């Protein structure tokens, strides 16, 4: 019994050591808050691009909330096609809109009227998502149900957020947390 308890504690510690930490007092969050408050003062809608990775739970979040969360329309990046498939899509919306999608940084990754954040779930949540996906589907999509592949994509995404020991972009551990932070800062 004691040996199994020690093993469980060691596994939890290993998972925590592999995870990342962020502090919403970091200057990147202050800058984000100032941008969102400026948009509100200018009477512009909240337009938010959430960058994430494969297996982060984007589709589940959108479906679970019926494409609406805290007064914001939730848009799936995968539903758009063509050369204009970028955060510039948000400029067509006159009401609060959140575009959830891939973490690649394109030429539109710094539009003045679009706020950008990342969502990178904890390793524990990733493992839970993969287990649920594998449990509920008889024929698995090779990449989206492969924990090794998803963890690799997660690491690549974290490499965009943190570089050289500093945080470059706001990051949250869930879509709920990211949208809530931005909606509250904006004043939705």
Model features per residue range: what roles?
Residues 59:
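Walker A/P-loop
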Residues 112-130:
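Conserved phosphate-donor/acceptor-positioning beta-strand/loop module used by diverse small-molecule
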Residues 18-37:
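N-terminal pre-Walker A segment at the start of P-loop NTPase domains
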Residues 55:
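Walker A (P-loop) phosphate-binding loop of P-loop NTPases
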Residues 136-188:
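Small-molecule kinase domains that catalyze NTP-dependent phosphoryl transfer to phosphate-bearing small molecules
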Residues 52:
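The Walker A (P-loop) glycine that initiates the GxxxxGKT/S ATP-binding motif of P-loop NTPases
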Residues 63-98:
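Conserved substrate/cofactor phosphate-moiety recognition/catalytic segment
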